[in-house]
């Protein structure tokens, strides 16, 4: 069994990418479980065709404790037999959502949820790098990390931060970076830029997913593209990514870069202009 995690900046399309990719894996005959580690609890909605799966934390609150839960209450089987779990989290501004991740994974292990699987995937909130959300990395639960990013500066910034987290636990937990997944935003020279970022982080751009409105059309129906329009070229993109992950033998210890180096990379690719420091943060009319 391989345990992998998808990290990425909020809004980058991480959950969508993860669900479509896991759907493609299941289509290939792989036995898959998705563990959602995001308080939004939207990591399984396209597989289950539901708004949001009831989370472990929510069910535990209703029952009194995690120990009172039955596995079939928290683990729901969706399309293609994909097993789905949402860890969930507390109400906004109350408590630590990362604790939900820790509690859920520990419960799933004790309840025997990991038996007879080819892949377990963790869908993790990526721009908050607190200890709870880093738990799949920190305790060696996920051995392979895939970072969903794009050619936008903040998505790249988050990717670099996540790489820094992987590096921190690479020697103690054995976790490795499997690659960057570029979920295209149609920015200038995006594929070249992410390939170069990957090179500097000592990894690969494992796949470039082109932008396609069919993804949104499928999401509105709470479906993966694989199910909604299986013959669409976008469905083939997710199938190709799934095959690349299955066959991936390039798992590395990342080499994060500094913020200055990231800005230099953007300047090198013409995304940012190298301007006189005196006009930085000045409006166009003032400059």
UniProtKB/Swiss-Prot annotation:
Gene3D superfamilies: P-loop containing nucleotide triphosphate hydrolases (3.40.50.300)
Keywords: 4Fe-4S, ADP-ribosylation, ATP-binding, Iron, Iron-sulfur, Metal-binding, Nitrogen fixation, Nucleotide-binding, Oxidoreductase
MF (Gene Ontology): 4 iron, 4 sulfur cluster binding; ATP binding; metal ion binding; nitrogenase activity
Binding-site residues for [4Fe-4S] cluster, renumbered to this chain: 96, 130
Co-factor note (free text): Binds 1 [4Fe-4S] cluster per dimer.
Presence of the UniProt keyword DNA damage in the record: no
UniProt: ATP binding residues: 8-15
Coiled coil start-end: none
Pfam families: Fer4_NifH
Nucleus among keywords: no
Cofactor field: [4Fe-4S] cluster
PROSITE patterns: NIFH_FRXC_1 (PS00746), NIFH_FRXC_2 (PS00692), NIFH_FRXC_3 (PS51026)
Catalysed reactions, as listed in the record: N2 + 8 reduced [2Fe-2S]-[ferredoxin] + 16 ATP + 16 H2O = H2 + 8 oxidized [2Fe-2S]-[ferredoxin] + 2 NH4(+) + 16 ADP + 16 phosphate + 6 H(+)
Maturation and modification: The reversible ADP-ribosylation of Arg-99 inactivates the nitrogenase reductase and regulates nitrogenase activity.
InterPro entries to which the protein is assigned, alphabetical: NifH/chlL_CS (IPR030655), NifH/frxC (IPR000392), Nitrogenase_Fe_NifH (IPR005977), P-loop_NTPase (IPR027417)
Quaternary structure annotation from Swiss-Prot or TrEMBL: Homodimer.
Function of the molecule: The key enzymatic reactions in nitrogen fixation are catalyzed by the nitrogenase complex, which has 2 components: the iron protein and the molybdenum-iron protein.
Family assignment from sequence similarity: Belongs to the NifH/BchL/ChlL family.
Protein name per Swiss-Prot or TrEMBL: Nitrogenase iron protein
Organism: Frankia sp. (strain FaC1)
């Amino acid at each position: 069994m391989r345990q992998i995690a998808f990290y990425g900046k909020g809004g980058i399309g991480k959950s969508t990418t993860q669900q479509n990719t896991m759907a493609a894996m299941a289509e290939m005959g792989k036995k898959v479980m998705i563990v959602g580690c995001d308080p939004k609890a939207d990591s399984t909605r396209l597989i289950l065709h539901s708004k949001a799966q009831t989370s472990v934390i929510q069910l535990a609150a209703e029952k009194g404790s995690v120990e009172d839960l039955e596995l079939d209450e928290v683990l729901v089987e969706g399309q293609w037999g994909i097993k789905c779990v949402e860890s969930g989290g507390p109400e906004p501004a109350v408590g630590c959502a990362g604790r939900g991740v820790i509690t859920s994974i520990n419960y799933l292990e004790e309840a025997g949820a990991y038996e007879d699987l080819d892949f377990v995937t963790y869908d993790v909130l990526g721009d908050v790098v607190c200890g709870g959300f880093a738990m799949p990395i920190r305790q060696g639960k996920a051995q392979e990390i895939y970072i969903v990013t794009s050619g936008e500066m903040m998505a790249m910034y988050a990717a670099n931060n996540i790489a820094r987290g992987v590096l921190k636990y690479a020697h103690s937990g054995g976790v490795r970076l499997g690659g960057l997944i570029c979920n295209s935003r149609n920015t200038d020279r995006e594929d070249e830029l992410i390939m170069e970022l990957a090179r500097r982080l000592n990894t690969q751009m494992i796949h470039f997913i082109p932008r396609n409105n069919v993804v949104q059309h499928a999401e509105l129906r709470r479906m993966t593209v694989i199910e909604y329009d299986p013959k669409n070229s976008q469905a083939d993109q997710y199938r190709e990514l799934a095959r690349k992950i299955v066959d991936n033998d390039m798992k590395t210890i990342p080499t994060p870069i500094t913020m200055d180096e990231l800005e230099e990379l953007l300047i090198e690719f013409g995304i940012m202009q190298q301007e006189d420091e005196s006009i930085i943060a000045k409006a166009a009319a003032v400059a």
